[in-house]
Design a protein with these regions (language model features):
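N-terminal glycine-rich anion-binding loop in soluble enzyme alpha/beta folds
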Residues: 1-55, 115-144
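Glycine/small-residue-rich loop that forms an oxyanion/phosphate-binding "nest" at active or ligand-binding sites
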Residues: 53-108, 112
């Protein structure tokens, strides 16, 4: 299996760090990791997320040529997930959606802690979109 980890932001160090973690977690899987060099340096709220989408979409032909089996959007707010899913040649999941799905599978309620207040509305909207409103006790910013 060949998975593509797509970092929506333009920070190469973040891409490398997440790829390292993914490779350790799943050594039997080939992890390809790319940085969205057309995106902002960080995804902090809806405006940054919106600014990242075109760059992510521009990477999809390359992803198809690279014969990846699935794409992971490597930002908890699942930047551009719906548009990328609609345009991709393969399954696409965001790490936020994956985390919420896993938490819900365990059958207990869960909460989400993010770093900045500006990220709360985007993540809270995703909780609703994915159908986890009743399972999620809230989305909170740590201020870190």
């Amino acid at each position: 299996m060949r998975l593509l980890y797509l970092n929506p932001n333009a920070t190469e160090a973040m891409t490398e760090s997440m790829a390292l973690v993914a490779r350790k977690a799943a050594p039997e899987v080939e992890i390809v990791a790319w940085t969205n060099h057309l995106g902002p340096t960080a995804i902090q709220g809806a405006e940054d997320g919106d600014a990242a989408v075109e760059g992510l979409l521009s990477l999809l032909p390359k992803a198809k040529d690279a014969a990846v089996n699935a794409i992971i959007i490597g930002c908890f707010d699942d930047t551009g997930l719906r548009r990328i899913r609609a345009a991709a040649h393969c399954p696409v999941i965001g790490i936020g959606h994956a985390a919420m799905s896993l938490a819900a599978l365990h059958g207990s309620r869960f909460g989400i802690v993010t770093s900045l207040d500006i990220s709360v509305p985007v993540i809270a909207a995703n909780v609703d979109l994915y159908g986890y409103r009743d399972a999620c006790v809230g989305v909170f910013a740590s201020g870190l």
